[in-house]
């Protein structure tokens, strides 16, 4: 019996500490301006399953109170730096307000007094966002490329997982990954320098292609899949970098030569056209229309 009483008291104490009561401050003045936040989320339209829109307030203040209100129980947060929204309560609030809107009110404490900004809104869509976003994770400089990975993030949370890390491929350069209409079962990406080649994933099979031919400028570079999954358009480029003395981190990347080719997956053949490979032009960044009937690209004189 004593053991049961102990657990009851423990649960009660956890409940008291877990449900923090945010006392509403006495507002000295309404500022009648919007708070300066980063990222600039004011007026955003949110998919109903998006992860919490955490942000930083860039105005001056010693402490912040943020109230997110709509149908259902509001969320009240106090912060001194970044505003981190609890994910469970965020999901409940989005679900209750899909097709409606949320009002966000920010109050600032300065020298012991509270000031309130004008509220801004987030509209909540009834539509959901795709489950994942894939990207290359690399340090923000051209030099440190020996540590990188192709990653994916679950967009309903902040869970990040690796698709492939270059620690497993000889610390080479891995880049230019694309999917066919967002389908993770049809993917390509390039590996440079060590173990060089184009990795092609389709139909449960994975193969590495040597894509340089005597008739093309380079190995495959920037890709886009035909919606049928039967072909991929690639650019072939000779790329250079220029550096500025005025600022060491300003880099210009440009092509000295550039063509577009089409790769037939089933035949393992490459072909092109004078419209896509003109010696007097630079053709780049191919992109198929959603119905696959048009191929768009950038072109300019050399």
Describe these PLM feature segments.
Residues 15-18:
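C-terminal motif of bacterial Sec signal peptides marking the signal peptidase cleavage site
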Residues 30-40, 73-89, 156-173, 201-219, ...:
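Multi-bladed beta-propeller domains
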Residues 37, 114-143, 215-216:
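Low-complexity, Pro/Ser/Thr- and charge-rich linker/hinge segments at domain boundaries
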Residues 38-59:
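Contiguous beta-strand segments within globular domains
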Residues 131-144, 234-256, 298-302:
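Short, conserved, GDST-rich strand-edge loop motifs in beta-rich repeat architectures
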Residues 132-210, 215-216:
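Conserved, compact domain cores that house catalytic/ligand-binding motifs in diverse enzymes
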Residues 186-187, 229-232, 292-296:
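Hydrophobic beta-strand positions that form the internal "hydrophobic ladder"
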């Amino acid at each position: 019996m004593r053991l049961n009483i102990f657990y009851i008291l423990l649960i009660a104490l956890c409940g008291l500490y877990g449900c923090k009561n945010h006392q509403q401050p006495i507002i000295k003045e309404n500022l009648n301006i919007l708070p300066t936040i980063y990222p600039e989320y004011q007026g955003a339209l949110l998919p109903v399953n998006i992860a919490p829109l955490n942000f930083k307030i860039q105005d001056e203040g010693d402490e912040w109170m943020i109230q997110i209100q709509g149908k259902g129980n509001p969320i009240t947060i106090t912060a001194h730096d970044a505003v981190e929204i609890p994910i469970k309560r965020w999901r409940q609030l989005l679900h209750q307000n899909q097709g409606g809107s949320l009002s966000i009110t920010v109050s600032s404490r300065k020298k012991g007094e509270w000031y309130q900004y004008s509220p801004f809104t987030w509209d909540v869509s009834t539509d959901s966002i795709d489950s994942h976003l894939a990207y290359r994770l690399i340090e923000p400089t051209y030099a440190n490329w020996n540590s990188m990975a192709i990653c994916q993030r679950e967009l309903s949370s902040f869970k990040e997982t690796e698709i492939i890390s270059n620690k497993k491929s000889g610390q080479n350069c891995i880049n230019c990954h694309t999917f066919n209409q967002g389908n993770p079962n049809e993917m390509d990406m390039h590996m440079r320098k060590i173990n060089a080649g184009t990795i092609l994933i389709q139909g449960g099979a994975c193969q590495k292609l040597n894509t340089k031919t005597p008739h093309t400028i380079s190995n495959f570079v920037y890709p886009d899949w035909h919606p049928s999954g039967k072909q991929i358009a690639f650019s072939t480029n000779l790329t250079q970098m220029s550096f500025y003395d005025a600022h060491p981190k300003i880099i210009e990347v440009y092509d000295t030569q550039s063509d577009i080719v089409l790769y037939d997956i089933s035949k393992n053949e490459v072909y092109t056209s004078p419209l896509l490979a003109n010696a007097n032009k630079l053709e780049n960044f191919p992109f198929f229309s959603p119905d696959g009937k048009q191929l768009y690209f950038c072109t300019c004189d050399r």
